Design a protein with these regions (language model features):
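Short, charge-rich amphipathic segments
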Residues: 1, 81-91, 133-145, 252
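Active-site-adjacent substrate/metal-binding segments within catalytic domains
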Residues: 1-114, 159-160, 265
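Soluble non-cytosolic domains of exported or imported proteins
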Residues: 6-10, 79-86, 144, 148, ...
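Detector for Asparagine
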Residues: 14, 32, 54-55, 79, ...
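Alpha-helix termination/capping residues and helix-transition junctions
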Residues: 21-23, 97, 173-176, 259-260
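Low-complexity, flexible helical/coil segments
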Residues: 29-30, 74-75, 140-148
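Aromatic- and acidic-residue-enriched segments that line the glycan-binding/catalytic groove
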Residues: 39-68, 79, 97, 107-143, ...
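Extracellular glycoside hydrolase catalytic/binding regions
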Residues: 142-146, 152, 156-174, 181-295
Length: 295
């Protein structure tokens, strides 16, 4: 439900009303909406601020943005105002009023809402590079896991978000009864080849999950990965398993990630068509294997 992050109060309330009637107890939402730097111009049609250097091409969503690049500060700055984190505040308020819980993500591997690539673009801006409104390539995206400056910005955002005071409730976000867990990213991956080794994501997840716990030890933390395994190409073939999901190609090792003390649960996804799964065989094996890994 990524659209909750930027939609109107009435739309957000309607979603929670409907979800409550359906008996839903937990909703996952995006806790990030990152854009480039302000152009100083207003869009004549929408009346919204405009930005340049957006990783997803468009930047703000309905005028809402959570982080943007500030040339004067020389770093990304958090927008805690009416068109910023106050949107998240209202979502949390509605969750509390409907007795529901939220899984809140900190970033996204994909370009939607800026994601990891926006951090990379911010770093490029800090180095005086000219950046356009298009997503960065995969090689540069993987710098998100290893560049120390980028990692410090990511940690700064986490610290600000968890300590942010909700405009409507007066509580820090991390003290809200609506928080079920924090998620490091939506679907983090780092394709293994000459620029990304299979321990990069593990090391990043270990460091960042520990950092979250150092601020908020009372809520669960998940990595947010899709649950890929790292059996190797030969072993995946020997077991007649879909290579993309089991070989380790995406730089994710679900078995290893589940050994991190500061990671509380796994988040396997399943895209049957995209991953070449056979219905009834591969999908059931995927579910059973993850259940076994986390048991």
């Amino acid at each position: 439900t990524d659209y909750l992050t930027y939609k109107s109060k009435s739309e957000v309330k309607n979603v929670f009303d409907d979800a409550s009637k359906m008996g839903l107890k937990v909703i996952r939402i995006w806790g990030n909406l990152d854009v480039g730097k302000k152009t100083g111009e207003i869009d004549s049609q929408s009346g919204h601020e405009t930005f340049e250097g957006n990783n997803d091409g468009t930047g703000e969503k309905d005028g809402v943005y959570f982080q943007y690049w500030d040339d004067e500060a020389g770093k990304p700055v958090v927008n805690e105002g009416e068109d910023g984190l106050r949107h998240l505040d209202y979502i949390i308020k509605q969750a509390e009023e409907h007795d529901m819980k939220l899984v809140i993500t900190f970033t996204n591997y994909w370009e939607a809402f800026g994601g990891m690539g926006q951090y990379v673009k911010w770093y490029q801006m800090s180095q005086g590079k000219s950046v356009g409104n298009s997503k960065v390539d995969e090689k540069d995206t993987c710098d998100f896991y290893t560049n120390e400056t980028i990692k410090s910005w990511y940690k700064d955002y986490i610290k600000t978000l968890l300590n942010h005071t909700n405009y409507y409730t007066g509580e820090k976000l991390m003290d809200s009864e609506a928080v079920f867990s924090w998620e490091l990213s939506n679907e983090p991956r780092c394709t293994v080849d000459e620029f990304c080794k299979d321990d990069i994501l593990y090391n990043w997840a270990k460091e960042m999950s520990a950092y979250v716990k150092s601020i908020d030890p009372y809520h669960m933390v998940s990595v947010g990965d899709e649950g890929f395994y790292n059996l190797g190409y030969q072993e995946a073939a020997r077991q007649d398993l879909p290579s993309s999901a089991y070989s380790g190609y995406y730089g994710v090792d679900f078995d290893k990630l589940m050994t991190i003390d500061t990671v509380d649960f796994g988040t396997p996804h399943m895209y049957v068509d995209q991953w070449g799964f056979d219905l009834g065989d591969d999908d059931l094996e995927w579910i059973k294997r993850h259940a076994q890994t986390t048991s």
